[in-house]
Swiss-Prot record:
Disulfide bonds: none annotated. Keywords: RNA-binding. It comes from Sorghum bicolor. This is Glycine-rich RNA-binding protein 2. Possibly has a role in RNA transcription or processing during stress. One of its GO terms (molecular function) is RNA binding. Transmembrane segments: none annotated. Signal peptide: none annotated. The keyword Magnesium does not apply. It comes from the Eukaryota.
Length: 168
């Protein structure tokens, strides 16, 4: 990856439903110039999926944000802040939005490849970084499959015993 392509991006998990792009940016602006902040929403309902990304202009800003914000409270919820995976190639069966999966994809894939992933909706086995945020199939936000954040069907998932299922 060329130096110009380097992104200093944080994954932010455990967001309150009320947190939006602006409040996310404001919470992280103290650590340096925020290039982008994005709360990921469900395409069908428009509701927050409980996680997002913040991109900084420098590596030091990103590292400071991770160190100082991980485990802290934002809008009444304790958040998780980690360095985000690279977007990868964006094509084929994985990658960010590529092929049969990708970020928010429906058929495996996942953020940065693997099976399942962030927003993967079917037959997910991977998730964030390949092993699932919390392990198992489905990953963070997965709808079909076990594991994921909260176990069962993922954070707010439709199947399994998620513990974080806001649909009741």
């Amino acid at each position: 990856m060329a130096a110009a392509d380097v992104e200093y991006r944080c994954f932010v998990g455990g967001l309150a439903w009320a947190t939006n792009n602006e409040t996310l940016e404001q919470a992280f602006a103290n650590f340096g110039q925020v290039i982008d902040s994005k709360v990921i929403t469900d395409r069908e309902t428009g509701r927050s999926r409980g996680f997002g990304f913040v991109t900084f202009s420098s590596e030091q800003s990103m590292l400071d944000a991770i160190e100082n914000m991980n485990g802290k409270e934002l809008d009444g919820r304790n958040i998780t802040v980690n360095q985000a995976q690279s977007r990868g190639g964006g094509g084929g069966g994985g990658g960010y939005g590529g092929g049969g999966g990708g970020y928010g994809g429906r058929e495996g894939g996942g953020y940065g490849g693997g099976g399942g992933g962030y927003g993967g909706r079917r037959e997910g086995g991977g998730g964030y970084g390949g092993g699932g945020y919390g392990g198992g199939g489905g990953g963070y936000g997965g709808r079909e499959g076990g594991g994921g954040y909260g176990g069962g069907g993922g954070y707010g998932g439709n199947r399994g015993d998620s513990g974080g299922n806001w649909r009741n």
